[in-house]
A protein has these predicted regions:
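Bacterial N-terminal signal peptides that target proteins for export
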Residues: 1-9
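A detector of low-complexity, intrinsically disordered, Ser/Thr/Gly/Pro/Ala-rich segments
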Residues: 4, 18-19
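Bacterial N-terminal signal peptides
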Residues: 9-18
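Sec/Tat signal peptide C-region and signal peptidase I cleavage site
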Residues: 20-24
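Sequence/structural signature of beta-propeller domains
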Residues: 25-370
């Protein structure tokens, strides 16, 4: 019989977990890859520099970053009256070679190599929509064919074995408070390129059943999820140390990662890994060389992190202030600013990864092999 999954205590002392450093982490170095400071877009009050980088993806050798420019989670105007996010295309040297303004707050960004375009979701809390961006061309707006049944917005996007999967973020914003069994946690998106609409169907719901993945007495038990904050998602690579080939959803405030085996098939199965801290984006290095690119929303920069990576390790942007139990004044004691961490895929414990170079508060993350 399924039961609700209560917090699994992985670390007895949270502060001790925060202080721990991943072995070999001192070999990692950060450097500034790009900044929005010298890139401008037009607003009702004139030209202003773009700001608040968030999601990040790559296509055709270039890197694409969504700058939210202070727009609110339902598309509300920034303090300067701006209503648009800006997606910027950077070349390998960090030079801006293209940009597109999108109406609303861009929260999700991913490449669709099959069509050679970038997909962007708009407004994480409500009044959501979507854009397809053609490199060297225009951004085309798409509306959802029906109101989202999760009564919220949309966030991260993954292309998983040909399926476009989108997180149903901020469930219950315009309806009953989450969790609700009828609220989709992840949507399958189907595009009508003639009508410029997207049909959204549930992949699984906020109260779907899953198997506990953490090592310990509860491992293997079936539980009912109670997701309140579906956020980032990923296609777990085949070389990952665990959950290889799965689709993964991060429920940020709930401190959980949901792994879906056989996503989209008739007999898909879910596993839940409880984390010691909340996380945003996750990346799995493919080998010791390459680079991890991460946005820093607080510093308006994109950083490049290099070093000797462990193949298949699970790196994450750790976001203590986004936990459901975070204090209203944050950062604060026990709730530091964002940091780069490594997740133990068996226990869910997170250790801090030490960096030399400029301080980084990671958010969106992307690993690129050489």
């Amino acid at each position: 019989m399924a039961r609700r999954y209560t917090a699994l205590i992985v670390c007895l002392v949270a502060l001790a977990c925060l202080a721990t450093t991943a072995s070999g982490a001192s070999s990692f170095k950060s450097s500034v890859f790009a900044s929005g400071a010298g890139i401008f877009h037009t607003t009702p009050k004139g030209r202003e520099a773009i700001s608040f980088p968030d999601d990040i993806t790559s296509l055709g050798g270039d890197i694409y970053v969504a700058f939210q420019n202070g727009v609110g989670p339902q598309g509300q105007a920034s303090t300067t009256g701006n209503l648009d996010s800006t997606v910027v295309e950077f070349d390998a040297a960090g030079h801006a070679v293209g940009q597109w303004d999108l109406a609303g707050k861009c929260d999700g960004l991913t490449a669709e190599p099959q069509i050679g375009q970038v997909i962007a979701t708009i407004n994480e809390d409500a009044h959501s929509s979507l854009y397809l961006i053609k490199p060297g061309g225009t951004a085309v707006h798409y509306a959802y064919s029906r109101p989202l049944p999760s009564k919220g917005g949309t966030d991260a996007i993954s292309v998983y074995h040909g399926l476009v999967l989108i997180s149903g973020s901020a469930p219950g914003t315009t309806g009953a408070a989450a969790p609700q069994a009828r609220y989709p946690a992840v949507y399958r998106a189907t595009f009508n390129t003639t009508a410029h609409t997207v049909t959204m169907r549930s992949l699984f719901g906020d109260e779907a059943r899953a198997v506990v993945a953490n090592t310990g007495a509860d491992r293997g038990q079936r539980v009912r999820l109670a997701l309140t904050d579906p956020d980032s998602n990923e296609d777990v690579p085949a070389y990952a140390r665990r959950f290889a080939g799965d689709f993964m959803l991060t429920s940020q405030g709930d401190q959980e990662q949901i792994f879906v085996s056989g996503a989209g098939r008739a007999h898909q199965s879910l596993s839940v890994l409880k984390l010691t801290h909340s996380v945003d984006d996750t990346a799995w290095p493919s080998g010791p060389t390459g680079a991890l690119y991460t946005t820093d929303n607080s510093g308006d920069k994109i950083y490049k992190i290099t070093g000797s990576f462990a193949r298949g390790s699970e790196l994450a942007a750790v976001t203590p202030c986004d936990q459901n139990n975070a204090p209203s004044t944050c950062p604060g004691p026990g709730f530091p600013a964002n940091f780069l961490g490594e997740i133990n895929p068996n226990t869910g414990a997170i250790v801090r990864v030490a960096l030399s170079g400029p301080a980084v508060q990671p958010q969106g993350m992307l690993f690129l092999a050489p």
